[in-house]
Amino acid sequence: MMLPTKRPAPDHGDDERNEVMVPEPKRRTNLKKNIMGVGGLSFNKIVLNLEPMLRIWVHEAVEAAIRSSIHPSSRPSLNRIEASRGRRLQLRFVDKPPSTIFTGSKVEAENGNPIRIILVDATSQAMVSSGSLSSIKVEIVVLNGEFGTDERQDWTENEFNASVLREREGRRPLVTGDLNITLVDGVGTVDNVIFTDNSSWIRCRKFRLGARIVQRSAGEVTIREATSDAFMVKDHRGELYKKHYPPLLHDEVWRLERIAKDGAFHKRLAYKNVHTVKDFLRLLVTDPIALRNILGGGISNRVWETIIEHALSCVPDDDEWYTYHGTAQRVELLLNSIYNVVKVTFDGQDYLPVENLTFSQKLLVEDAKRQAYKNVWNLTPFDRRAIMGPSMPFTDLLPEPVGTSNLLLQQHDFSGTRPDMPLGLNQSSTSFSYEVENPKPLQGIEPLNPMLRNSSFRMEGIFPYNADNSFSFFADDGFGTNQDNTQAQMLSLTSATPAWAQGSGFIFTPDYETSSISFLSSFPSCNVNDRSIGETREVCPKNRWLKVRAVIQWKSISRGAAKRRRQHWLQHGICT
């Protein structure tokens, strides 16, 4: 085997004579390794990997150059320095597009309304709503998502045109629909613009909407183009799996961010019977540690916070409520549809918002909450509409709390005389008087009128009568006797007017054969005449419902009052 010949020594200097000669094939091998890297990819593989990217870059650059050279804009260029007397206007998108748009769907704003475009003065920022410029024609184009990322507002017309995108080779037009819009009083709407291709084929994977005028404006007015926020365009097949903002209670749990349909989180939650957003939120409220363990102990704080933030943007159902009584029966909780405590009542008093509680009350509530969350099956559904009406806000039906003793026993005027009533009734002159000793507080009594705080509480025997204007509750047979089982006879609700000179008050009028409770009150601010509640009229809804509520409450305590009156009569020998 013959070795390669070396260069002769006499033809070179002393330095070159000492040079180590390397065979030619080894030189080529070292060069190839330097280019490809030791153990790197082959040249063909590198070409195959770089070719698509190079094609896109070359295609975009060549297309922009051809478009700017072959189709020069007829509009005045923003590269020119505008004269001091010239006017500068600009188009502007008012609404933001959503972060993700699907092919085949109309482009809409985040709130679901059409995207609006307005023409404003660049100096005063006032909208141009009159003149010939307020009705110019505008063209909608698609821009590369990288355009405007530096937040520059002084781009040139050529820069804007160079960022306009066209469809990929062999594809349909990138956008279809009404791409030319005529402004009306300086305002236009993007009603029917549809993407036909996704945005995954460009480097930033995002598009922007752009708007530019179609025809050149007269005079020295320059109108700058408008650009929208960047957004992604995905294939319409992904719309079936899109997230909801905000999510709804009945949405499946995979509608939440970071929970993929049929993914690991979804399967773990389904195994624990957490199928909807409502189930997710209920478990989050009652036992957040258990929820996080279901998702996996290794879940990062960032992923956890993202899921929780999206879930908490859900709006609870205002018509679904629950109550829970504590073990001591002193605290009653009012919970919403996801088991959050919204109001609390103590000893049957009015419901109070949680934020208005004292420190000691909050301790009691926390203890009751722990009991409730351990026994969620003991929560009682509570339909507030059955008591307060469907159209009345919850807080509107909570009058100022007043102590029962202050309301009923301020003026211990329990007289039994039978004076001549202003109602014109024929009554006997039999009379009696007594005082109540150690009266039991009556819970839940609230005034119908502020004047009732100083009103007396009278018990007078009368015969049944007919009156055009009355507010009466005909009670049970045997009221005032020792009968325990009663049967309501009639509930008559009509508009009430003052019938006595002492002011607003309650009058107990027991008849010894058939007793009745005449419930009279006056509401100067809400006066109605000779009309029943069911008729169409202008009334004060709050006062009307307060009347009904008070009547129902008086019905619930009438039995105890009758027993005490019976005992007093027996002690004084009034009856046998």
Swiss-Prot record:
Belongs to the plant ACBP60 protein family. InterPro entries: Calmod_bind_C (IPR046829), Calmod_bind_M (IPR046830), Calmodulin_bind_N (IPR046831), CBP60 (IPR012416). One of its GO terms (cellular component) is nucleus. This is Calmodulin-binding protein 60 B. (Microbial infection) Interacts with V.dahliae SCP41. Interacts with calmodulin (CaM). Residues 1-80 are annotated as: Calmodulin-binding. It is found in: Nucleus. Its main location: nucleus. Transcription activator that binds DNA in a sequence-specific manner, likely 5'-GAAATTTTGG-3', to promote the expression of target genes. Required for pathogen resistance. It comes from Gossypium hirsutum.
